[in-house]
Amino acid sequence: MFHLLRRLLSGDTVTRENAHYKVCAIYDTETCNYRTADGWIAYPVLFIVNDLRSVDLADYVYNESDNVFFYRHGQEFVEYVHNLVSWGKRNRITPIIAAYNLMFDLQPVIALLAASYDMEVNAQSSTNVYTLDLMQDGKCVLRFWDAFHLDMRGLSAMGDVCGLPKATGSWDYDLIRTPETELTAKELYYAARDVQVIPAYLKYLLDANEWMQSDMFGFRIITKTSIVRQMAKNKLYKLRYRKGNGKRASIGFSYDRMCDRQSPKTFDVYALRKTCFRGGFTFTSANNASKVVDNVASLDVTSMHHAFINGRYLPCDFHKVAPATLQRICESIINTDLVSVLSQYHKPLWHGVHVRIRFDNLRIKAGSAFDAWQIALIPMSKFKLYENGEYEESESKRFAETHVKLSGWHDNALDPVFAFGKLYSARECTLHLTELELWCLSRVYEWDNMRVILGEATAHFSRPPDYVTAQSHYLYELKNEMKDVCKRYDEKPLDCSRYTKLDAPIIAGLETGIYTKDFVQSYYQSTVKGMFNGIYGVQAQDVYKPVYTVENGHIHVDEDSAVTEWTFAEKAKDNKSKVLYNYGMRIVGGSRMHLVIAIELLYRSLDNRVSVLAGDTDSLKIRCDVDVTDNELLQALKPLHKAITKAIDITSERLRNTQPAVASTLDNVGCFEVEKCGNFNRYAYHMEAWNKARVSIDTDAKVHVTCAGLSRPAGAYTIETFIEDLLDTNAPADVLPLALGYNVFIPHAIAHALEHSQPDIDDTVDMYITDYLGNTSRVQAHKSIALYPAGRMLGDTSKRANAYNLRYVDVDTSLKVLEPAGDGKDAHVTYMNGDVLL
């Protein structure tokens, strides 16, 4: 206290540690796109600020609490920032300015801010940050926070959740404006609404979570995952249990200790474990790709990751082992039969390993389900020369992966055959595997010789930490309670005596009937299910990936922060993150094993009466003969259902005994269910194109498309509309391979895609522009990011990953264009020269 008083009297500013954070403003911009001879550019025409420095977000009231300012030039907004910084210093507050898609709105002013402040950043990529701090004398004096990470579905979805819908239709983005263009009252209303949705959403979060405080926003609560972290810390961390020695400890403290004990102690161990990590099992059956089939069932696993958060013992205390010993351990793993695995599904194998193994003549296992349907397991993305990642990843994560690979830690293959993002065969390959992945490998592939090169192993297994399983149990029960509320609530007072997990503010709102049904549904779908689904992500984080730095306003990966064998010890000592990476590997590894076993059981029981077409982490698409019933599908999977239910009961026994107030029965977790396909349990027609790209037609002739890059705005003409139009006069077998095929160009009128130009922060506009009112003025501003309409090219075979698929599919690879219906013309498919194909 004396030191703080002395510094205050001397006029020193207050440090980050004793100046509290407060959301003081919400920020947004409106920009104008302008077509030049060199392409699209954009510049800002309006800066919007909702000043909330005198408002407690817990008491926020739409319109009453708002204090909205409009600025037409970037320097005016920067002056506002300067004034807010000065106010924060006087009041011992670190102000936070929140925005949605922050870097889009900071683009035209970041160079101006960089002229006055140093900057520090916590980022996912150079264009997607969590927070950006303005620094003076090494101290944070203002923080920008991107609220996008609380709900990534858009401001409109955020507004729907909190009951303040985003304004639509009042700002015509096709009109040319300048900073001097007079704006209408409707346009200003539209612009203001975006800076009102965020405080309304934050108010909603405070009302929905009794433990949450407004000073957590932008500090302790930055992302949806951090909401889960803080919920656990405030509601569960201090729950106590009695240890074997009779002493009592909190489950949170025990978890922290376990994270410290199980963290890698050397760079080699870190790199080995990182290289062993696999994502969810996403695959396409090469034998069935781009083929239209009928009578397709969709099977989903109930809460797949939670099955292995709660149903799998964790290998602990790894140590390096000689290759000869590892060889014997690995041979025992691959010789473990399916019956043994299912009988001890909580601990299916007797050893845990992280190993590097060389295989000779690796190929799909003859006579297996994976041979019958040509399904492969090993991801192409783990190999050193793979250029385009199978999944979108952050620059930091890609840099960490590349750096580890350059250090020699990567899979490699000689004469490999790749397709659909997977390795089908290789004359020789070196793989990095856990015990779960090695066992799965033995079910999918066969080989002539296997030689273990190096690795670590353990025979010690323990239950997963109660701190994490308690989160899963608690949120599963909360999810079920809210699901029940959604069925019962009709905007009248509701008897809530049956509910034990709902927070008091939610109970109060339900019992008085003040909530709308839309609010209740949004709370269930967005908040409760969002938190439930966020638990796994915490354990899968690489806490040693490099960070981002800012130089003169330019954000980039700090290459010096990448861990190496020379810097690892120092970085490990400084690391305070509590993540159990081995646990995350076993959670996702369990999900991969679950799908592998399911495929094998379906083949054993139903043989060629079914075909597994594709899978995605927790789901399978299965073509069925017309006489295959739902009951037959589930009976084939019954051994797996019994195994996971028993595994969860064994693994969760301690938590249920010591923490009954938060424990759950976890009914049906890990079990497959046959999903509705429209009004029936089968799709009439279905086609898998490649991973995560599929089209289905239900029995009511409604089309369902899943494909990255193809938006489906409500009420718009979309790819689904286009296919329905073609199906009026053509058969599914003719339409689907062309609509979702290789080298198919889909124009903006169908794809509704946007491209963007990313100017440098120093790029400026200085030109005379005539606005839509006919007024000409000189525009001098830093450039904004230009968003402009664009089409999408599907299955571009000039890209290596797509070209590899052609080994297995017989399709038309000529360039084609989808032409939408309109202006008296029917929908059709043409070649690039204009000839009509369909």
Predicted regions and their residues:
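N-terminal accessory regions of nucleic-acid-interacting proteins
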Residues: 1-25, 29
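Conserved Rossmann-like nucleotide-cofactor binding loop
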Residues: 32
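Conserved acidic
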Residues: 18-20, 35-838
